Amino acid sequence: MYPHFCAFVMTSTRNCLTWAASQLAPTGEGDELSGQEDAFRSWAVQTFRAACETFDVRSKHCIQIPKRYTSNATWEPEQYKLTQSPEPLDLNKALSSIHAKNLFTMRLRSLQNLHSEKSSRTTLLVQLTFEGSRGPSYLPGEHLGIFPGNQTGLVQGILERVVDCSSPDQTVCLEVHDESGSYWVKDKRLPPCSLRQALTYFLDITTPPTQLQLHKLARFATEETHRQRLEALCQPSEYNDWKFSNNPTFLEVLEEFPSLRVPAAFLLSQLPILKPRYYSISSSQDHTPSEVHLTVAVVTYRTRDGQGPLHHGVCSTWINNLKPEDPVPCFVRSVSGFQLPEDPSQPCILIGPGTGIAPFRSFWQQRLHDSQHRGLKGGRMTLVFGCRHPEEDHLYQEEMQEMVRKGVLFQVHTGYSRLPGKPKVYVQDILQKELADEVFSVLHGEQGHLYVCGDVRMARDVATTLKKLVAAKLNLSEEQVEDYFFQLKYHEDIFG
């Protein structure tokens, strides 16, 4: 699926071997969709042992592999305990500590559904305002990282199934035995908080448990059939079928195996950390100095080929439920190589179907500001957009038309994939049938820029189309066009 999966590591390994370096252990690869944590655990132990053997590190040096890598796949309740804590939770401080990020708080100004009433889906224009001063600076094309909260229903469902959770709102501190097992120390993974707060803001309760987590859970099953089934799911083939069919949340696992008696300390120590979600910023700070705009598709889907329970995207659902003035903990993440050209006279082609349009709104807002307030005339900026139907989900349609009238956008080309009685048209079709000469002129003749934003499958199809186009124009072989392509000013911001 990902054409450049682990590309940096693979390239580095090849180069090192070319330079006659000795490889201590096989290169490890981690796929977050397929047990990255377990893959790293196995690789780390193997590499550590290989390094000790190669460099003659003996036991007299008292070097040991940490228990978390060498211990068997069990969880021992006597190694953990909960103590009450008087410390109130400072959410921003806690999130900053857990994720090592400098957070700031924004407030929701408004939510606007960009789809028409004819659409069954929702894509939001999210307008956030800074608290107090202007706030941190950002550039068009950068991302806003948001720390969402899990759905209340999921959290409550888990709390109702925890065996030792009589006071879910009591602030507690998780303590663990030190390596020697002689005294208790505070676990640094989470700050003192209530179990409800941990499940809401800090812990990932929607990602399917790993095989290792299922193995640890099996000990809490009081029915033998449940324990055996959980053990069976630790086998790769069984696990992958179960995972990709059900994509279960942690609550759904507890519902599937109702005899599980899970203690609170297990949740606090074993559930993965809830990660921030990233969204392309859809505004220019020069154009809207005290605001950040986002373009957010509200994600809902059913598992089991449409027959399973309804699942909701964690962050998009959380955002959709916000009320005006609600706080939003966030931070800015720079995106290397996805900014407007330093030379504004250089032509650009922007390709962004669906919510892939998000960063390009910040581009045209910046160009509008530069034109109106700095007298800068930008080069040709051609936009290629795609959606299902012009009367349902053509995001920012009126704004695009306004940018054309004002000369900010040179042209807008749109492909629709769900027009009744007409063939599906995607952005790569437009490039091939309508813009082949313009693309070649911008990339080859004028050394301009081409930007692609959207999902990985679309980006792959666009890249394939462009390579064929360039190869035909310059009469290049497949290998030659690959080399040439890397020399072009070709920018991608893609997601899974």
Curated annotation (Swiss-Prot):
Underlying gene: NOS2
Positions that bind NADP(+): 121, 300, 355, 388, 417-418, 424, 426, 428, 461
Enzyme Commission designation: 1.14.13.39
Keywords for this protein: Calmodulin-binding, Cytoplasm, FAD, Flavoprotein, FMN, Heme, Iron, Metal-binding, NADP, Oxidoreductase, Ubl conjugation
Biological processes annotated in GO: peptidyl-cysteine S-nitrosylation; positive regulation of interleukin-6 production; positive regulation of interleukin-8 production; prostaglandin secretion; regulation of cytokine production involved in inflammatory response
Secretion signal span: none
Binding-site residues for FAD, renumbered to this chain: 143, 277, 279-280, 295, 297, 301, 314-316
Name of protein: Nitric oxide synthase, inducible
Localization per record: Cytoplasm, Cytosol
